[in-house]
Each structure stands twice: as C-alpha cells, then as structure tokens.
Amino acid sequence: MSITAAQVNELRKVTGAGLMDCKKALTETGGDHEKAIDYLRTKGLAAASKKAGRAATEGLVGSYIHAGGKIGVLVEVNCETDFVAKNENFQAFVKDIAMHIAAASPLYVRREEVPAELIEREKAIYREKAKESGKPAAIIEKILDGQINKFFADICLLEQTYVKDPDKTIQTFLNETIASIGENMSIRRFAKFVLGEGLAKKESDFAAEVAAAVGQ
C-alpha cells in the first residue's frame, strides 16, 4: 500500500513523532491512522506528544569543540525545570546533539524555519528535472514531494538521521529522551563555527616571489 505525504504529516502532527517513524508506523499498519498511533505509542515514540504543550523555559547551552579547535558548536536545549537541566541524561543529550551538529552540519532546527523562497527554488529545480523524464504530472508531484522531504532531511536538524544511530532521526532521539526524562524538551537553536570559514586566504604571487628572490 502506498503511504502519502499527507498521511505522514497528519500522523506527525498528532503524535509529535518523526517523519520516518510515522511513515514506518503507517506502513506497518496498512495506512490505518489509529493503529499507527497505537504502534508509535507501543514503541514509546508518541509519549512526547502528551508533554508537548508544557512550557520548556529552563535548560542548557551546550558546546562541543572538535578537530583541534577548528570546529565549534553551541546549542540551546530547553526543558521544564532546573532540576532536569542538571540531570546527567539531559546533559548527555545536549552534548550528543552538539556533536551531531558538528558532524552533520544542519542549517535549521525544523522545516518551519526554512525560508519559503528557498523551498520554492528547490521545488522549481526538482520539477524541471522531473519534467525531462516525460512522466505524467501526477507522478511528477509525487516525485516532488519525495525530493522536498529529502531536502528537509538534509538541512533540518530534527529530520536528519542521527549520526550515532542511523536507525533513528534526531526527532526520534528527542522523543525518546523526553519519554525517558518525563519532561517536555525542545532544541531551540544552534550555531556552528568553522575556523577561517568565509575568509579569503591570501594567495602569494609566485612569480613575484621568484623575482624578489633573484633580485636579492
């Protein structure tokens, strides 16, 4: 049975589970929405949705430095209480997220943050490529949905495959941690710094150097 993007998105809204988890749940349950919710609950992936409405205003700004100080990451993860912010599991989660960001280089936390013009530009590129295949318009739109979801999975932190466990997304990892800790959590923002990024390196004029050496 073919699972549509609309089905996946609807299940995601209801449960708060990751897109890949929602798609798997729908596939395993033959596209039945209610059974898919139960499937996610049995896996502990929908538990976080019950806590999603609670304010998460405490938390921690974590950091990770890699490659001899050439790559650095700051990430803010929020929780509900200062007590949980001091919890070892919470702090380990923050560190793991910072390490993932250093390795995977996401651009945004969630797809809602991606500028509309960037999405439209990507859609236009994918649509033109699909048209060249000569496929019917309906098929092209399905291909387009898949390509855009892949685009989001590449640049959005919550939809990326977790580098330490390729079987789950960061959203799944977050949901599991929420279920384990018992408080709502949110990855608010992050920044990645790469030494020298954006700076133009001065290139020496080899001919001038030779001439100068000869003249000495």
Curated annotation (Swiss-Prot):
Membrane-crossing segments per the record: none
UniProt keyword terms in alphabetical order: Cytoplasm, Elongation factor, Protein biosynthesis
Domain of life of the source: Bacteria
Residues annotated as signal peptide: none
One Gene Ontology term, aspect cellular component: cytoplasm
Keyword Transferase part of the UniProt annotation: no
GO molecular function terms attached to this record: translation elongation factor activity
Subcellular location: Cytoplasm
Region of interest called Involved in Mg(2+) ion dislocation from EF-Tu, as start-end residue ranges on this chain: 81-84
Role noted for this protein: Associates with the EF-Tu.GDP complex and induces the exchange of GDP to GTP. It remains bound to the aminoacyl-tRNA.EF-Tu.GTP complex up to the GTP hydrolysis stage on the ribosome.
Family: Belongs to the EF-Ts family.
PANTHER family reported for this sequence: ELONGATION FACTOR TS, ELONGATION FACTOR TS, MITOCHONDRIAL
NCBIfam families on file: tsf (TIGR00116)
Protein name: Elongation factor Ts
Annotated organism of origin: Geobacter sp. (strain M21)
Protein encoded by which gene: tsf
